[in-house]
Each structure stands twice: as structure tokens, then as C-alpha cells.
């Protein structure tokens, strides 16, 4: 193992750290990283698998604003009920709107897990209407993925609370694909489709850079290896939203799958999570015995 003397002190250097430092300086002493990795480092949650520790993180613009907001002193933006929203948001729903607008600004996935009947639907509709009045720095169509049984309900709720929002239902044997679908997306604010069709029409849906992908009854993707879950994770979107329809059941990996959809690669891989849980359980069993 290499030892070097620096200012009269011997320092032990790991080979992995040396190689990573050489690569960093070869690239010009700067590097880029995904936003989720920057968030980890800003919060002191860096990936221990990296041989070279990070001593500091410098950012500018809206990324700096986001990282500074993780200090615990952040405040939600002052947002009133959007004009032409045909309803009355309750105080907690207005808080939900502000929270989603804050996270959407930075492209951070949002899990809105209010109990059934508390109005998750209208909070998302209010966000869509808010963005029509005060568009963010990045706008585009929203893809809403729902169980087949609630397509009609979402269509009615959108028409009731935000009639200005144009909606297309991507469903049925005669649904448009490829160029025809892209033309329809350009003409509408919201595209509603089902979980099954996301996998079946994945090539068509992946041609679109969505502003937002929102999942109703998000427990439909609780099994990470399924083709359905993989297809939904592969969708390109600035902002991702999940509405879990029921409490987490049985396995922590069910929750992991939803969180992985919301913020890709922020958490450790599912296999690592399962190994960690297994080891922890073994330790608990050993302690108890």
C-alpha cells in the first residue's frame, strides 16, 4: 500500500483514490454529475463506493438555490388558488399545491400520499392550472397514467375543475401512434393512458419529452423487475408525481420501486437494499438470541 510524506507526515493513499483523482484532473479538475448525486453530496449522503471523498460542492443558478434549500430553512412559495380553477382548495390542499410547485421547479419527484378522499386529484389539477398562469422555466405536456377503471373519473374532474386544460385519452384499439400521436400531444395539455399501454406503446410514448409523468394508484409499479414498472421508469420527464393508493404492504422494496420512479438512482439499487435489510435482520436475530 502506498505511503507518501506530506509536510513531514506520512499519509496512506488507497489505490482507488489515486486513480479517481487522476481521472478527475485529466478531465480538467472539474466534473459534472446528475442532480440527484449533487443532492446526496449537499446533504452529506455521498456514495461510499467512491474511492475519493468530496471535500466541497460549488453550484450556481437554480441548482445553488435548490441545494441551499436543503438546509432546513426553506419556505414554500407563496401561491394563491389559481385563477379559473373551478373549485375551492382547502388549506391543506393549498399547501400541497405549493409543495408540488416547489419540487416541480427543480425537477424533484413528488409522492403525494394523502389519505383517500382528501383530494389528491384536485391538487394535481390545481398545479396544472397554476402552471398555465405562471409557467415554469420548462413546460410541456403531462402524461397521466391511471388504472383503466378511473380514466373517466380523471377526464370528468379535469373538465370540472380546469375546463381550459385540453385532454386526450390514449386508449382503445384505434388509438394513434407515432407521428399521429406526437401531433395530438402537441395540441393537448394532458394525455391520459393506462399502465398496460405504457409498456405496449413504450416506443411511441418514449418519443416525447414529457414535462410531467404522474401515476395514480402508483402501487401498480411496486414490483421493480416487471416490464410494466421498467417501461414507466424509462419515460423521459422533467417532473414525476406518484399517488400511492394504499399503504405499503409487506415489502420495503415496494416503496423503493415508487421512490426509484420519482427520482431515478437517488436511492441505492434494490439488490443493495435487500442485502442491507437481510444483514440487519440477521444482526437483530443474533442479538435477540
Predicted feature residues:
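Charged, low-complexity intrinsically disordered regions
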Residues: 1-66, 255
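ASCE P-loop NTPase motor core, strongest for the SF2 helicase catalytic module
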Residues: 55-285
Amino acid at each position: 500500500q502506498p505511503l507518501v510524506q506530506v509536510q513531514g507526515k506520512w499519509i496512506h493513499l488507497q489505490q482507488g483514490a489515486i486513480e479517481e483523482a487522476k481521472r478527475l484532473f485529466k478531465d480538467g479538475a472539474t466534473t459534472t454529475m446528475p442532480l440527484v448525486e449533487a443532492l446526496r453530496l449537499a446533504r452529506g449522503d455521498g456514495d461510499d463506493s467512491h474511492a475519493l471523498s468530496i471535500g466541497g460542492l460549488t453550484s450556481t443558478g437554480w441548482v445553488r438555490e435548490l441545494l441551499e434549500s436543503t438546509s432546513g430553512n426553506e419556505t414554500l412559495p407563496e401561491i394563491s388558488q389559481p385563477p379559473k380553477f373551478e373549485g375551492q382548495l382547502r388549506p391543506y390542499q393549498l399547501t400541497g399545491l405549493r409543495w408540488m410547485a416547489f419540487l416541480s421547479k427543480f425537477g424533484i419527484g413528488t409522492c403525494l400520499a394523502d389519505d383517500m378522499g382528501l383530494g389528491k386529484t384536485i391538487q394535481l389539477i390545481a398545479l396544472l392550472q397554476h402552471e398555465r398562469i405562471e409557467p415554469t422555466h420548462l413546460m410541456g405536456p403531462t402524461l397521466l397514467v391511471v388504472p383503466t377503471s378511473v380514466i373517466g373519473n380523471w377526464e370528468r374532474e379535469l373538465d370540472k375543475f380546469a375546463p381550459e386544460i385540453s385532454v386526450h385519452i390514449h386508449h382503445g384499439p384505434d388509438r394513434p401512434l407515432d407521428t399521429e400521436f406526437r401531433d395530438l400531444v402537441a395540441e393537448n395539455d394532458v394525455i391520459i393512458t393506462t399502465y398496460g399501454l405504457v409498456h405496449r406503446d413504450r416506443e411511441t410514448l418514449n418519443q416525447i419529452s414529457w414535462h410531467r409523468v404522474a401515476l395514480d394508484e402508483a402501487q401498480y409499479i411496486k414490483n421493480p423487475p416487471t416490464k410494466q414498472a421498467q417501461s414507466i421508469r424509462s419515460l423521459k420527464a422533467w417532473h414525476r408525481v406518484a399517488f400511492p393508493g394504499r399503504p405499503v404492504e409487506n415489502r420495503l422494496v415496494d416503496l423503493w420501486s415508487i421512490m426509484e420512479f420519482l427520482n431515478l438512482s437517488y436511492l441505492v439499487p434494490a439488490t443493495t437494499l435487500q442485502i442491507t435489510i437481510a444483514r440487519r435482520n440477521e444482526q437483530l436475530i443474533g442479538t435477540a438470541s
